């Protein structure tokens, strides 16, 4: 976040007034996020992870992808308050952390954003495979460890080159090798490519193939044992939500890469417009951490039953409920 004290307004009082309005608008959104979105996202993401881990026997591949997205959402949920109320915004000495802490938070945010995008992409591609060959892949979780390792490991590896530019941009005075890698715009361009362009191309390709298959009237499409239709609604809602919330963030990165409005523009009005847009896009990106579990909770019809089993287990303890013992005794009798 930013404050209106960063730049001097010498032209008129309108720019100062507009800056204060932008600042107040983002401040209200930040407070609302901290009061509403943060606890809701924390609760529902933890709930999504625990419910699926407890019901491992009934997990499907969509559940695996949503668990990974929920874990990434928890990380983003933890980073968001530090960003929204950080030292650049509040000027509090309590938040005066160094470059190392900033880089750590940036790494966590970038990796988590890639995990969310890659999980959404793989969900789309796997759903296409399931539509083409029903009951062959998504109903099984035999390769869960490999999928999770691929998602998180791939996110770390693909973001490594971008992270080098970010690190060298902040600690170049300490590392001689970083003297030629002080280009934040290059890091932003890499993140746009690997975190948005590649996933959206893959998702669009998968959705086109899925649409073609659903238009064809084949016996496989009429099969009663095919994948739950609610998975299709969940897929469409997830893809649309993720790209709606993350597109502004990557667009601002792209604009900053090719224009660098904060440096090249001498007009403080346009600088503040860009900073306001950038702050709003970051807020939308943070919002994905609580919107996604809400969508999953309301569309996935099997989640409520899994949650009830988990709550019953927690309520009864490891020895089981009284009515369960009664049923067992009746069967034995």
From Swiss-Prot:
Q: What Gene3D superfamilies does UniProt report for this protein, alphabetically?
A: Rhodopsin 7-helix transmembrane proteins
What ranges are annotated Cytoplasmic (topological domains)?
A: 43-65, 124-146, 211-234, 297-333
Residue intervals passing through the bilayer: 22-42, 66-86, 103-123, 147-167, 190-210, 235-255, 276-296
Task: Give the InterPro entries listed for this entry.
Answer: GPCR_Rhodpsn (IPR000276), GPCR_Rhodpsn_7TM (IPR017452), GPER1-like (IPR047143), GPR146 (IPR037487)
Bilayer disposition of the protein: Multi-pass membrane protein
Keyword Hydrolase assigned to the entry: answer is no
- Please, which domain of life does this record's source organism belong to? Eukaryota
The terms describing its cellular component in GO are: plasma membrane
Q: Which residues lie on this side of the membrane: Extracellular?
A: 1-21, 87-102, 168-189, 256-275
Ordered alphabetically, the record's keywords are: Cell membrane, G-protein coupled receptor, Glycoprotein, Membrane, Receptor, Transducer, Transmembrane, Transmembrane helix
**Residue positions the entry lists as glycosylated:** 8
Q: Which GO terms describe its molecular function?
A: G protein-coupled receptor activity
- Extract the Pfam families matched here: 7tm_1
Q: Where in the cell is it found?
A: Cell membrane
Is this entry keyworded Cell membrane? Answer: yes
Q: Which family does it belong to?
A: Belongs to the G-protein coupled receptor 1 family.
Question: What role is this protein assigned?
Answer: G-protein coupled receptor required for the regulation of plasma cholesterol levels.
* Name under which the protein is recorded: G-protein coupled receptor 146
What is the originating organism of this protein? Xenopus laevis
Upper taxonomic classification of the species?
A: Eukaryota, Metazoa, Chordata, Craniata, Vertebrata
């Amino acid at each position: 976040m930013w404050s209106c004290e960063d730049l001097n307004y010498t032209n008129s009082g309108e720019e100062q007034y507009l800056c204060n309005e932008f600042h107040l608008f983002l401040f209200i959104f930040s407070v609302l996020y901290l009061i509403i979105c943060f606890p809701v996202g924390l609760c529902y993401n933890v709930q999504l992870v625990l419910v699926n881990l407890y019901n491992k026997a009934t997990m499907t591949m969509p559940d695996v992808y949503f668990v990974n997205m929920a874990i990434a959402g928890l990380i983003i949920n933890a980073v968001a308050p530090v960003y929204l109320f950080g030292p650049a915004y509040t000027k509090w000495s309590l938040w005066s952390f160094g470059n190392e802490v900033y880089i750590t938070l940036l790494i966590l945010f970038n990796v988590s954003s890639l995990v969310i995008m890659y999980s959404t992409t793989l969900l789309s591609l796997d759903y296409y495979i399931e539509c083409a060959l029903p009951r062959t892949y998504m109903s099984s979780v035999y390769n869960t460890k490999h999928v999770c390792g691929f998602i998180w490991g791939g996110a770390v590896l693909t973001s490594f080159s971008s992270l080098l530019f970010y690190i060298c941009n902040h600690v170049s005075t300490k590392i001689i090798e970083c003297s030629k890698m002080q280009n934040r715009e290059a890091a932003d361009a890499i993140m746009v490519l690997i975190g948005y362009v590649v996933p959206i191309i893959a998702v669009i390709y998968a959705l086109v193939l899925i649409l073609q298959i659903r238009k064809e009237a084949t016996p496989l499409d009429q099969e009663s044992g095919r994948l739950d239709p609610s998975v299709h609604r969940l897929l469409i809602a997830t893809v649309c939500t993720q790209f709606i919330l993350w597109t502004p963030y990557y667009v601002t990165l792209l604009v900053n890469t090719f224009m660098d409005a904060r440096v090249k523009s001498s007009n403080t009005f346009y600088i503040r417009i860009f900073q306001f847009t950038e702050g709003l896009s970051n807020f939308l990106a943070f919002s994905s951490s609580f919107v996604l579990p809400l969508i999953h909770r309301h569309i996935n019809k099997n989640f409520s039953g899994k949650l009830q089993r988990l709550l019953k287990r927690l309520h009864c303890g490891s020895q089981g409920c009284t009515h369960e013992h009664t049923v067992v005794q009746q069967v034995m009798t």
